Amino acid sequence: MSPKITVEKLNLWYGDFQALLDVNLEIREKAITALIGSSGCGKSTLLRCLDRMNDRIEDVRIEGSVRIDGEDIYRMKKADLPRLRKKVGMVFQRPNPFPLSVYKNVAFGPKVHHMAGGAEIDEIVERSLRAVHLWDELKDRLNESALGLSLEQKQRLCIARLVAVKSEVLLMDEPCSALDPVATLRIEELMRRLKSDFTIVIVTHNMQQAARVSEETGFMLLGELLEFGRTTDIFTAPRDKRTEDYITGRFG
C-alpha cells in the first residue's frame, strides 16, 4: 500500500538558521505516527510543513517535497491551499474553539466549504460530536458558547470540527499538554478510535504517550530525522545510540 504522506529531502530555513536537514519520511495511511525529540529538534516545524503552515512565517525558505496522496503540496497554487487545509487539519497544543456556540463551531467548516445546508448541517453536527464522544455531554448545550467548555471538551470540539469537514489527515501538536492525566488518556483513546478513518501524526514530548498510541515513531535531533520505524522497535531496540540515550533519559 502506498504511503499517505511522503516527505523527500525536506530542508527548511528560518532566515539563516536551518531547522530541518534532509528529512525523508513515509507516513502510513490510517495509522498513528509519533514524532519525538527534545525542544527545538524540529518536530513541530516538520509537522507544520505537512499542511504548509510555515508559509505564514516571514523569512522561511523550504526545499524538497511533501506529497499527500501523490500530490506535491509545495507545487500547489495559493488558491488551492484551502483545499489542502480542509484535507489536512491541525489540532494545537491549546484548544482554540471559535468564540461561537458549540453548534456554530462544528457547522462553520461545512458551511464555508459549501458542503451542506439546512437539516444536513444538523446531521453533520450530531455525527461529528458523536465521533468525538461529545454528543451526550453537549446535546443540550449546543447553543452555549464553546468558550465555557472544559479544556478536554474544547480539544474534542476542535477535533469534531475536522471530522465535520471530512479531513483525511489529523496533525496533532502536543494535543494533551494542557490536559490532566485522566483527560489525556481519554484523548488517547479517542485517537485510537479515529485512526480507522484518519491518518494521524502527533508531536509529543511525552514518550510514554508515543509508546501507548502510535504504530510508528520518528526521533528527531537538531533538525534531522535520526531514526524512524515501528514504535516497539524504536523503544525496545533503537538502532542509533542517540535514540537510546534520549529514550532512556540520558539527555533531552
Show which residues each predicted segment covers:
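Short helical segment in ABC ATPase nucleotide-binding domains corresponding to the A-loop/adjacent helical element
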Residues: 51, 103-112, 122, 126, ...
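ABC ATPase NBD coupling module
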Residues: 61-62, 72-89, 112, 234-238
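Conserved ABC ATPase "signature" region
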Residues: 65-72, 119-140
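Conserved ABC ATPase signature
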Residues: 143-149, 153
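Catalytic Walker B motif of ABC-type/P-loop ATPase nucleotide-binding domains
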Residues: 170-173
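Helical segment within the ABC ATPase nucleotide-binding domain
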Residues: 185-196
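ABC ATPase "signature
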Residues: 228-229
